Design a protein with these regions (language model features):
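Auxiliary alpha/beta "docking" domains used to position bulky ligands
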Residues: 1-172
């Protein structure tokens, strides 16, 4: 079993079915887009910090990216964003990522793992796109073919070499 399929199997045992992998060497297209975007609220102003996974984990080689769908079973009235209604998703996702890491770690002695939610400097939507988990809509949201844009994103930065997935070639019109 490959490391990627092992991580996917662990995620599936936790009922997480939207997983993929991408290289920790970030694409030049992303670098250009970030340069042109200018300052982004809640993100580090330094492009180098947003584009250098090895600043977070030395010898990082891959990201294992997981989507966490959050659309409720029924629509509720209200003016609070759907992702903000349940428990703090940062804590929930972090617990799932830690469980995956704890389960995988004994199989990969000497390898390192770092759980990331959207509080890291990494560009989580781009990682999910690069890992084949969705495409960008006109609104710049990541859209998954099944879950739509009702997802939050978590990833595991690792020194493991994971076979990268291909980005989806879909669009919304």
């Amino acid at each position: 079993m490959t490391p990627k399929s092992h991580l996917s199997q662990i995620a599936a045992s936790l009922h997480l079915d939207a997983c993929g992998a991408c290289s920790a060497s970030l694409d030049s297209t992303l670098k250009e887009q970030l340069r042109n975007a200018g300052p982004i609220p809640f993100a580090p102003s330094s492009l180098a910090e947003r584009l250098d996974p090895s600043a977070l984990l030395r010898d990082a080689r891959s990201f294992f990216v997981i989507l966490f769908p959050y659309r409720p079973a029924r629509e509720e009235e209200g003016n609070i964003a759907l992702y903000a209604r349940p428990m703090d998703y940062h804590k929930v996702i972090h617990r799932y990522l830690q469980k995956i890491i704890e389960t995988a770690r004994p199989s990969y002695p000497g390898e390192q793992f770092l759980p990331l939610v959207d509080t890291s400097p990494m560009v989580d939507r781009w990682l999910a796109y690069a890992a084949g988990l969705g495409f960008f809509g006109r609104n710049h949201c990541l859209i998954h073919p099944t879950y739509g844009s009702f997802v939050t994103i978590g990833s595991i930065l690792t020194t493991l070499s994971l076979t990268p997935d291909q980005p989806l070639t879909l669009d919304c019109g």
